[in-house]
Structure formats: C-alpha cells, structure tokens
Curated annotation (Swiss-Prot):
GO terms for cellular component: cytosol. Gene3D superfamilies: Glycogen Phosphorylase B (3.40.50.2000). InterPro entries: Glyco_trans_1, GS/SS, Starch_synth_cat_dom. It holds the Pfam family Glycos_transf_1. Pathway: Glycan biosynthesis; glycogen biosynthesis. Belongs to the glycosyltransferase 1 family. Bacterial/plant glycogen synthase subfamily. HAMAP family: Glycogen_synth. CDD domains: GT5_Glycogen_synthase_DULL1-like (cd03791). This is Glycogen synthase. SUPFAM superfamilies: UDP-Glycosyltransferase/glycogen phosphorylase. Synthesizes alpha-1,4-glucan chains using ADP-glucose. It comes from the Bacteria.
C-alpha cells in the first residue's frame, strides 16, 4: 500500500504544549496512523515551550514578513513525531498559555496569530518546500479554520482538506475589519466563505470550505446538527451532513498504562486490581481525605466550567457527602467555581479535597486511586478522562451526551445481565439526575462482584488509537481517490 503524506496543523500538541484534549489527539494520532501507512508531519506554533522541547531543529524556510514580523519555519522532531514549527517570536513568544495572557484575557491579536499558522499550513500544501508535498491537510479546531480558505482563494491547486471539530463552543470570531490584514481577497467575505454574522468566523470557514469535516464522536456529530448543540452552526452542518462524520478519539495507551505508569504510587493490571487500594490510600492523603478504604472515592479531573457541569456537582455535594462518599477534584477555570470548590473543601474537611490548577502526575494518581470518575458534562464532544478511567479501573459516572454516551456502557439491567457494562450514565443533565446517579453508583459499589466486573470490563475495553486511526486512514484515502 502506498504511504500517504498528511500534514496535521494544530495549535497545541502533547508533550510539547497542552491546554486540553486537542493536544493529546494531535500528539497521539500520528503514531497510530503510521501503522496504517500514513506518514504525518505536524505543524504547530513556536511557543517558548515548543522551541525548548524540540530536537534537532533545522531552518527550512524564512519569511521576511508574516503578519508584522519575520519568521522561520523549522523542521524538527519530538520523540517519534516529525514536526514543522513556525518560529515567529512576535506572534508566539509571550507569557501565559497559547490563547490568553497572564490576566486571563484572550490575546488581542489572536486572529493574526492563528491566521499565520493556517496560512503557512496552506503554503506547505501548495509546495512551499520543494521536497515536501502532502496528500492531505488535516486542520484542527478554530485556530486552523482559515487553512482551507487560504487554499481556495489562492487560485492555485492544493491537496484535499479535513477539518476536525474538537469543540464547537470555541468558534474564533473576529471583526470584519481584520479582513484587510489576513491576505485574503474581499470575495472571501461571503456566506459561502469566511463571513459569519457580519464578522469573520474561523471555525465557520473550516466547516464551510474543508473537503471533509470530522468531529470526535458519532453522537456529537449528530448532536451538533441540532439547534441546542449546534451553537449557531447547525444549519451549515446539516447542509454539509454528507461530508461530516464522527470518529471517536483514543488515548495513548503507553502513556496511560497502569501496569507501567511511573506517575502512580503502585502499578497494577487487570489481574491485580486489588493493588489500586494503595493508590487510593495515597490519594486520600494527598487531598486531606479520611483514610477510609471502604469510602466510595469519586475523582474529578476537569476544566471548571458550565460546559463540564461542575456547577451541578457543587449543588449536589451535600447528597454525595451524605451518602458517605468522598471527592478528590483537580481542575481550574471559572473563578466562581474555583472559589466554590475551595470553600467546599473547607466546609467538608476529610470528605472533599480540591486542588485548583492542573498537575499531570496528580491526574494519573486520581485515575489510579479513585473508585469512580465523575464527568457530568452538559455537552462533551468526546472526552478523554473517561477513556483513561476505563483503562485504570476507575468506574466512569457520566452524563449521557456526546462521546460519553458512545464510550461508557451504562450498568442498566440488560448490560449488567449480559456482562458488558462499564460504568454509569445519567440523563438529563440536571442536579436531580446526578444525585440519582450517586445512589446507583453507591449500590453498585456495595456489590463487590458487580463493581469488580465493571472494572474488569473497563480495563479490557480497547481505548487505544488503533480503531480511530483506521477510520482516519480510510477517510484520507477516500479523499485522495476523489481527485
């Protein structure tokens, strides 16, 4: 089989830079695609963390002027990943995370910062480097939404494009006045181009102009064609439904492997699940919880936001505590929720612990030590924490939405009888339904055999990138064959 060359363009990539699940996908999918005769090179911005983490950087192109300054394109590696890094200090070398400054506000020039990434991605697809000609360009989320626009309006032929929605809530909307600085013609500003409610929509541009659209679960692909989850783009998504598909994410099962995880206190596998008790003890101590081995310990690893349903959990905490359970929460985000969980930890000492922030090692320890992992999201395109939870034997308790519905088999009567259940689902996404899920989870936890079966089923579920990579490889090959 002929090897396909794919350029993946994303604003973050693990292990170099990460703010969310996009980085995990961008970092793990290339290796899985290699087994399907797809060679991926990834283009990402030259943030300080990226420039400090790459190996053997070589300049392969220079730009005398790129949105207000000079820039270099570097070819480099990070482990087994092949990379292009856009080294543009005036755009990317600054404090804060990739999108916001230390004050928590979006950088005012984000429109230009990510237009540059998209423009260079398109240029690479059209022969910027004589020795590199990708068959497919795969762009991720709003930050790369202009990439197919740069291809379309250049007037020159280019490769096929795939645009993946990781979260429709983040749309990259900018004022019309930015158009004159983007290097796109006036005719690009139309309903069939980049125009969106009188301004410029980067995500909308990707959805409108890419050859194929994917999102990260089949259920989310269906949900976003409706008005509730479609967030103003459902009409366009319905129009392009024949070009839209949902492909579940996987996780890197080498990074997330309880049998070899150096970040957890005690390693274990499906044959030695009892060793999780040591991790639970360490986790309880880390969060200041009572050292009770028989207490049902819930873990949460999440952005603290309305989307993630963490306000509902805060409301339901008295019922969780009243049932004798404990909570270990790791997350940051909405200031009101941060304060709410910090206050809850003070109000319920020994039963609620909260670490505000993000700590990769602690996230691993929560997966290895919590009895159950709570994901009460109002919407969830795919979700990765529940996949890690399955892998680690932390029974997922999830809202029946998006990728959560696709990846967790609810312990209902039929699934329990047939021995396929892996967790607990609840619907609708309300405080009352969440409280009922606590009761169902508590009853399952009290049944030692039933709980162990949930853990075994979860730990033996294939949550790797093997199947998703096969779907992406087929998508790429089908696209190339359309020419």
């Amino acid at each position: 089989m002929t090897t396909l060359a794919v350029l993946s363009v994303a604003s973050e990539l693990f292990p170099l830079i990460k703010t969310g699940g996009l980085a995990d996908v961008a970092g793990a999918l290339p290796a899985a695609l290699r087994a399907n005769d797809v060679a991926v090179t990834s283009l990402l911005p030259g943030y300080p963390a990226v420039l400090g983490g790459i190996e053997d950087p070589q300049q392969v192109h220079s730009f005398n002027e790129l949105f207000g300054g000079t820039a270099r394109l570097l070819a480099a590696r990070c482990g087994d990943l092949d990379l292009f890094v856009l080294d543009a200090p005036h755009l990317y070398v600054r404090p804060g995370n990739p999108y916001v400054g230390p004050d928590g506000k979006d950088w005012p020039d984000n429109g230009l910062r990510f237009a540059a990434l998209a423009q260079v991605g398109a240029a690479l697809g059209q022969g910027l480097l004589p020795h590199y000609k990708p068959d497919v360009l795969h762009a991720h989320d709003w930050q790369t939404g202009l990439l197919p626009a740069y291809l379309k309006y250049s007037g020159r032929p280019g490769p096929k494009t795939v645009f993946t929605i990781h979260n429709l809530a983040f749309q990259g909307r900018f004022p019309y006045e930015l158009l004159g600085r983007l290097g796109l013609p006036e005719r690009a500003f139309g309903l069939d181009g980049i125009e969106y409610y009188g301004g410029i929509g980067y995500l909308k541009a990707g959805l409108q102009l890419a050859d194929r659209i994917t999102t990260v679960s089949p259920t989310y692909a269906a949900e976003i064609q409706g008005s509730e989850a479609g967030m103003g783009l459902d009409g366009l998504l319905r129009l392009r439904a024949d070009r839209l598909s949902g492909i579940l994410n996987g996780i890197d099962t080498d990074v997330w492997n309880p049998a070899s995880d150096a970040l957890i206190s005690a390693t274990y596998d499906v044959e030695s699940i009892a060793a999780r008790a040591r991790n639970k003890k360490v986790l309880q101590a880390r969060f200041g919880l009572k050292p009770e081995p028989g207490a049902l310990l819930y873990g949460v690893i999440s952005r603290l936001s309305w989307q993630k349903g963490l306000d509902l959990l805060l409301e339901a905490l008295p019922q969780l505590i009243g049932g004798g359970a404990q909570l270990a929460l790791l997350g940051s985000g909405d200031a009101e929720l941060e304060q709410g969980y910090a206050a809850a930890a003070r109000k319920y000492p020994g039963q609620v612990g909260a670490v505000i922030g993000y700590d990769e090692a602690l996230a691993h320890q929560i997966q290895a030590g919590a009895d159950a992992l709570l994901v009460p999201s109002r919407f969830e395109p795919c979700g990765l924490t529940q996949l890690c939870a399955l892998r680690y034997g932390a029974v997922p308790v999830v809202a029946r939405v998006g990728g959560l519905a696709d990846t967790v088999v609810d312990a209902n009567e039929m699934a329990t009888a047939t021995g396929v259940a892996t967790g607990v689902q609840f619907a609708p996404v309300t405080t009352d339904a969440l409280i009922k899920a606590f009761g169902k989870t508590r009853a399952l936890f009290a049944d030692v055999v039933a709980w162990r079966n949930l853990q075994i089923n979860g730990m033996t579920t294939d949550v790797s990138w093997k199947n998703p990579a096969q779907h992406y490889a087929k998508l790429y090959r089908d696209l190339v064959a359309e020419r």
